[in-house]
Curated annotation (Swiss-Prot):
Monomer. It holds the Pfam family Pept_tRNA_hydro. The record marks D97 as: Stabilizes the basic form of H active site to accept a proton. The keyword Ion transport does not apply. Its EC number is 3.1.1.29. Belongs to the PTH family. The active site is at H24 (proton acceptor). Keywords: Cytoplasm, Hydrolase, RNA-binding, tRNA-binding. This is Peptidyl-tRNA hydrolase. The record marks N14 as: Discriminates between blocked and unblocked aminoacyl-tRNA.
Amino acid sequence: MLSDELKLLVGLGNPGTEYEKTRHNVGFMVLEEIARKNNCSFRESKKLFGRTCEYGSGIEKTRLLMPNTYMNESGKSVRSAKDWFDFQNNQLIVLVDDMDLPLGKIRVRSKGSSGGHNGLKSIINHLGTAEFKRLKIGIGAPSNDQQERKSKTVSHVLGRFSKEEFIILNFIIQEIISCIESITSNNWEKISTRLNSYKPDN
């Protein structure tokens, strides 16, 4: 069914060169690699409050969106895209960093709470529902101690990956792209299982 097909991929992050390649921007990084592989260039869209590009044609056309609103207002951009392109919530996948997952792990969910992530929280508020697909990419936590973790959260998510971490991340990004390219109207569960069980050394 058309309503089950992928229409919009949203990568969450913060705009600006000072945030490029930071852990919080891993969603942007995935979309940038997808765009590179499909020879499409991002362009500014004032009406969508973000940068967009598209590839494919007809019912296989997929749009990429990187909000320019900063993380906490990501929902404004996603809502604008939903209204403009007139797609259903189940045609949306949001790619987002997750500090509760170690680097190298992926979690796919078809719905759920924000998990404390301000970008997801904003999207849920603007769409009026938590029933949309999200792909959480582990970036690890700065500490196992809760108090220390809280004090170091901002510097951690706005910090950049080390060379060793980036090697692992690249495996993750390539696996995500491979799965996204194979999504059809009836294999989401299979894709979810594959990503949820993926290990970078596979």
